Amino acid sequence: MAVGSLLNGYLEELLLAKYDKLFPVNADFTGILSDVGTIVGGATPSKKRSEYYCSNGIGWITPRDLSNTSDKFIAHGTDDITDEGYASCSAKLLPKGSVLFSSRAPIGYIAIAADAVATNQGFKSIVPKEEIGTAFIYCFLVRNKHRIADMGAGTTFPEVSGKMMKSVELAIPEQTLCAEFDFFAGPILKQQEALERENRELAALRDALLPKLMSGEIDVSKVDLTQLNSHLA
């Protein structure tokens, strides 16, 4: 798991370095965030209705879910919602590849939807325009999350509104550069998602085996490590 996390960190540095090279931070602003994607909020079904929540339904993400993981990709949080729960509120289903951005409590958690998901009202997420792509939006938010957070800092309860999020200024990327970055970033994002999945599977296996090893239910005292080493050599 440690090796996978280190590799993922290296890939993240590589991705952001390429972004910084193609899209310099000192470029003149030529548009706003709503020019490159659709800003989407979220909502919460009534907590008083147990039938609105389930363990295997529509992925529904809260800022707390992002605070509990270091993963870049997310498809499910602590709670899923049912079709009935989804229909009961104004939450919107975000397509795979949307970029989630927490807009309060706190401002600035970022993740990529690994599948279609909904969120609570603590997000102002971005559905990228096809010609812009997920990678550009993700990297832009990573590099500008503090600037965006400052926009909501003047309120009594720090929050970035939908209007604020839409108005975030940026340099509209040239199509040729967007295509180049998307071509470069695509394999990196796929590898990062695969590494995160592998880490979760290894963690689940560890958590399942460790209690059995500690209790003696599984006995490894008679395992011949010399034979194991000869197979690995």
What are these regions (language model features)?
Residues 72-73, 216:
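Juxtamembrane "helix exit" motif at the C-terminal ends of alpha-helical transmembrane segments
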Residues 219-233:
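Amphipathic heptad-repeat alpha-helical coiled-coil/stalk segments that mediate oligomerization
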Residues 8, 104-107, 115-124, 140-197:
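Glycine-anchored helix-breaking recognition loops at helix->coil/strand junctions
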Residues 66, 165, 214:
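Hydrophobic pocket-lining residues within nucleotide cofactor-binding pockets
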Residues 1-44, 55, 171, 175-180, ...:
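Non-catalytic DNA-recognition/assembly elements of restriction-modification systems
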Residues 27-72, 85-90, 153:
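Low-complexity, Lys/Gly-biased intrinsically disordered segments
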Residues 62-63, 78-144, 151-153, 161-162:
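A short beta-sheet element
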